[in-house]
Structure formats: structure tokens, C-alpha cells
Swiss-Prot record:
Species this chain originates from: Blochmanniella pennsylvanica (strain BPEN)
Protein role: Prevents the cell division inhibition by proteins MinC and MinD at internal division sites while permitting inhibition at polar sites. This ensures cell division at the proper site by restricting the formation of a division septum at the midpoint of the long axis of the cell.
SUPFAM superfamilies, A to Z: Cell division protein MinE topological specificity domain
Protein name: Cell division topological specificity factor
GO biological process, one term: regulation of division septum assembly
Source species, domain of life: Bacteria
């Protein structure tokens, strides 16, 4: 039984958690059918925390949510990483 658990159940990574949150945001947005970026400050904070675990001193320039039409929204995240040697 332990062997089955090893192959079928894995620990959730920060990427898995972020993906699930984004899916919930999108589904909630589709249900309410309104354009309210109430989640952007928390999403930005989560992205910075996750990226900071792997890369030191990330600099986020912008996080934007654009509405293309009634059913489509695009989340744009522009992040620039500076190499310590080139600074």
C-alpha cells in the first residue's frame, strides 16, 4: 500500500497551489461574469513569495488583467531577473 501511495500521491508544490488558485479565480470570474480585479494584490504577493524561494531579488514590473471580450481575460505578468554578476 505504501508503494501505491508513493506513485499516486505527491506533495503539492507551490506551482500546484498557484495553479489551483488561478483556476478558482477564473471559475469564480466566469460564474459572476464581472470584471473585478479584487484578487490582484494577493496574487502579486503570492507570486513574489514563490519566485523568491528560487531566485534572489526578483523585480516585478507589472501584473495586469486585461479583458478581451465578454468571456476572455488575460493575466499578464512581466518579471525581470537580474544576474548578480551583471549588476
Amino acid at each position: 500500500m505504501v508503494l501505491v501511495n508513493f506513485f499516486f500521491f505527491r506533495k503539492k508544490t507551490p506551482a500546484d497551489i498557484a495553479k489551483k488558485r488561478l483556476q478558482e479565480i477564473v471559475s469564480d470570474h466566469n460564474i459572476r461574469n464581472n470584471f473585478a480585479p479584487y484578487f490582484l494584490p494577493q496574487l502579486k504577493k503570492d507570486l513574489v513569495q514563490t519566485i523568491s524561494k528560487y531566485i534572489h531579488n526578483p523585480r516585478i514590473l507589472s501584473i495586469q488583467l486585461e479583458k478581451k471580450d465578454n468571456n476572455t481575460s488575460i493575466l499578464k505578468c512581466k518579471i525581470i531577473f537580474f544576474n548578480e554578476e551583471t549588476q
